């Protein structure tokens, strides 16, 4: 736990370390599982992605934003080193700025603009069980030797995932029996009581990974008007609102907010072939915390 504590403190967080007795008092579901101790983060929370997206959609429309859902972005229109717009499945859209916020597809989309970046999509899977009476309020994440997480929704389902350290990079949205078994075994080692729950759904998505585990945010030098907002390494839902706010301020004023100084969109120029390590997810954060 000291390693996790030091990593979190290096990131500016203030975790409360709790031992076996306090952990089991807060989370009886862990009774009988391995190593019931933890670091408590009081300010963390779980929110439902659909509800958040609905709220953002409604707010954007009130501001007059035109949303074109389900339309593929085919190419970036450019001339003389400047963006002129976007070619979409619904026709050309003229604009002096195009923001690449394509998540796991950001590397491929950036290439359409002639700007290579080392972003690499990496599959992650999750599962959800049938609903049960409330048995836990906190979300649980665990780190080394196995990494994963689980929490209970307001409707009573258990949602869980366990990372595969040897996952092959690339866009792959297929859910696998291998992941199902690995996740079930790992979660049951932590909370044996959950073995009575039945899995009802499983799915896969992709993380947008960068070699240094940091986002790419801001305009690029090679193509005026092309802006990166990607590479969130599986934390886009957390980072997206702040990145959006700071990036909008930057594009409006022409001045980069100090908080974005460490995420320069051109920092991999000349190193576009830098590799993403698919292993230990938190290793990049641990190293970053030690450096900071």
What are the language-model segments listed below?
Residues 188-292:
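C-terminal catalytic lobe of FAD-dependent flavoproteins
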Residues 19, 69-71, 201:
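Short loop/edge segments at beta-strand edges and connector loops
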Residues 38-59, 103-105, 179-186, 232, ...:
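Mid-domain beta-loop-alpha active-site segment that forms a flexible
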Residues 39-97:
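Helical element adjacent to the flavin cofactor pocket in flavoenzyme catalytic cores
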Residues 1-26, 147-149, 186-188:
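Dinucleotide-binding Rossmann-like beta1-alpha1 core, especially the glycine-rich loop
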Residues 27-35, 77-84, 134, 209-213, ...:
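A short, glycine/Asx- and small/polar-enriched loop/turn
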Residues 131-228:
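Active-site lid/adjacent beta-loop-alpha segment flanking the redox-cofactor pocket in flavoenzymes
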Residues 88-137, 173:
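Central helical "cap/lid" subdomain
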């Amino acid at each position: 736990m000291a390693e996790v504590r030091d990593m979190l403190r290096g990131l500016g967080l203030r975790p409360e370390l709790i031992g076996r007795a306090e952990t089991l008092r807060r989370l009886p579901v862990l009774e009988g599982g391995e190593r019931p101790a933890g670091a408590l983060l009081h300010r963390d929370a779980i929110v439902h992605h659909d509800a958040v997206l609905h709220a953002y959609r409604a707010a954007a429309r009130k501001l007059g934003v035109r949303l074109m859902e389900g339309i593929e972005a085919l190419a970036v229109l450019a001339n003389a080193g400047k963006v002129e717009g976007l070619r979409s499945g619904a026709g050309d859209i003229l604009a002096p700025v195009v923001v690449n916020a394509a998540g796991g597809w950001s590397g491929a989309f950036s290439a359409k603009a002639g700007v290579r970046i080392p972003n690499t999509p990496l599959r992650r899977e999750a599962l959800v069980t049938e609903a049960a009476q409330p048995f836990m309020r906190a979300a649980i994440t665990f780190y080394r030797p196995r990494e994963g997480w689980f929490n209970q929704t307001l409707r009573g389902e258990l949602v869980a995932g366990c990372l595969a350290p040897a996952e092959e990079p690339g866009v792959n949205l297929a859910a696998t029996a291998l992941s199902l078994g690995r996740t079930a075994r790992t979660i049951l080692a932590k909370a044996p009581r959950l073995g009575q729950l039945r899995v009802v759904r499983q799915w896969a998505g992709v993380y947008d990974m960068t070699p240094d585990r940091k986002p790419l945010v801001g305009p690029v030098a090679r193509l005026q008007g092309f802006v990166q907002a990607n590479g969130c390494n599986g934390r886009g839902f957390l980072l997206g609102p702040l990145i959006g706010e700071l990036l909008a301020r930057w594009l409006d004023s022409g001045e980069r907010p100090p908080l974005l100084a460490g995420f320069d969109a051109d920092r991999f120029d000349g190193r576009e072939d830098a590799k993403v390590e698919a292993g230990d997810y938190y290793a990049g954060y641990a190293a970053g915390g030690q450096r900071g």
